[in-house]
Amino acid sequence: DFDPAIRTLTEEEAMDESRRCLQCDLVCNVCTTVCPNRANVALLSLPMPHPVQVAVRDGDGVRVETLSNGRLEQSYQIVNIADACNECGNCATFCPSAGAPYRDKPRIHLSRESFDNAPDGYRLASPSRLEGKRGGKAFSLAAEKDGFVFESDALIAHLDGGTLCATKVTLNGDVNEAALSGAVEAATLFRLLARKQPFAGPKHK
C-alpha cells in the first residue's frame, strides 16, 4: 500500500487556498499589464441589459422571440487594439482562465487599413457609427436618438436604446430565422467605446 500521491486539503488549508482566489468573475485585468504593446485595454462598464433574441419570419412579417434577459454585470470589459497587437500570446500565458485575450476579446481597429486587412473586428468609423466584420462578412451599427440600427447581410434590426431589445426587424432575402446576438454585441461595444480615447478621436479616417 502507498500513501496517496495527492492528498486532500484539510478544512483550514482549503480556506487558506480560497483566499488566493483572484475573483476573475468580478474584475481581471492581468492581460492589460503583461502585454508588451499595451494592446489590451480595460474599459469601465456600467451594468447593461443583454437580451437574447431571435427573429423568425412569420407570414409576411417578422416575429421576435425573447429567449432570455441577461445582464452585463462586470465592472470592466477588455478589448484588444488590433493595430498594436502582434499576437505574441503573452496574455494567453498569464490569463488565469483558459482564455487567450488577443483572440477571444473584441478586436478594435483604429485605422481603416488595419480593419480592411482583417477578417474579423470592429472599427468606430464615426462618433455615431460602428463597423464590423465576422468571418469576412461586414455589418454596421448606427446610433440614433432613441436607439440603434444594426445592418448585416441577413437582417436590419432596430434596437431600443435602453433595453437593447429589438423593436423592428427586417429579414433579408431567403433568410427565415436569424439570431440578434450580433446586434446586441455591437450595441454593447459601441456604448463602451463611444467618447473614449483612442477609439473616438476627433478625426476618423
Predicted regions mapped to residue ranges:
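Polar low-complexity intrinsically disordered regions
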Residues: 30-33, 95-97, 204-205
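Ferredoxin-type iron-sulfur electron-transfer modules and their immediate structural context
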Residues: 1-84, 189, 194-195, 199
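Generic structural hydrophobic/aromatic packing signal, biased to beta-strands
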Residues: 1-2, 21-24, 35, 95, ...
